[in-house]
């Protein structure tokens, strides 16, 4: 049933001629539903998934952990890539203090040239992990039109795994 809902959502989103504000809303709703669907799939199937966010190219890529490393999610019913129109902007922020890079004691760069021994190119690891245990990396994604950053739709994934969608102007009750 969840597959039917996600497929119908993607089909509906693709057929509407909409304004920039509506495009931001539809893109945020589509991403929100995909994250929820992948989270449920991870728990039910016992597999681990991830999400790569490319805010410069306005793209989201869902990946799956296999024996060979991270690979693009190949599901016929589920679009593994979400490309936003050029009129929209993505603001992506990982949650939690563990992801702050400014106060690291050591440089995260490898000591050795890993390219020398590399066998084949793999996808880089995702920024967001969606694990079979129900854990999800906390993050916030804001999607808004270029001309109106105040019309921002936010997807908030909290440390407890709760996934929420906020409309422009809507505030978190905890804040």
Question: Where in this protein do the model-derived segments appear?
Answer:
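Alpha-helical hydrophobic helix detector
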Residues: 1-13
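N-terminal helix-rich module
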Residues: 10-17, 26-30, 40, 48, ...
